[in-house]
């Protein structure tokens, strides 16, 4: 089978993956985006032509859950929202919302979704659609600050992160979205380097 995916980056952890019949939206954030001109933001014209639109919210933080934007899209579009449990607060009553937690696995809108853990709040997602496998880490990362943390704190952070990553299938992921935060200081990319070697996207 021929595989094709178009990846669009918006801001912070916000990405879309456009397949032939499926649009996958991760952590879309629009509120307060001075970096993007209005014509660069995701709009309903971008939804046209897709049979299924999957909108993933990995946690309830403002970085990942822009309620004003994502729930304003017309209900006539074939949109399914997949939310972590903590993101359900103040969510409008819409017909196509799926709430999930770590360890869940289910099929929705002709896609298979596996839900993995996080080392912060919420979850991470593995999505398989149209023979393409995409992983979005949410806030899963090796959260350590080498200049500030004690050795014990760093060790605990490493153990927690390695444990979460070990659950993700190897040699299966085609596209991996993972956070990088230079505010962590030295070795801020340690988590990204590890997940690349571990799951080999």
Each predicted region: which residue ranges?
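N-terminal pre-catalytic "stem/leader" segment of glycosyltransferase-like enzymes
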Residues: 1-20
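Active-site-proximal beta-strand elements of phosphoester/diester hydrolases
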Residues: 6-9, 24-27, 112-118, 133-139, ...
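Pre-active-site segment of Zn-dependent metallo-hydrolases
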Residues: 16-73, 140-170
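A short helix->loop->beta-strand "cap" motif at the edges of active sites that frequently abuts
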Residues: 22, 75-80, 197-201
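Active-site environment of divalent metal-dependent phosphoester hydrolases
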Residues: 32-33, 60-68, 86-91, 104-106, ...
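A short acidic, amphipathic alpha-helical/loop segment
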Residues: 67-73, 93, 190-195
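Metallo-beta-lactamase
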Residues: 77-132
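Cap/insert and terminal regions of metallo-dependent hydrolase folds
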Residues: 145-201
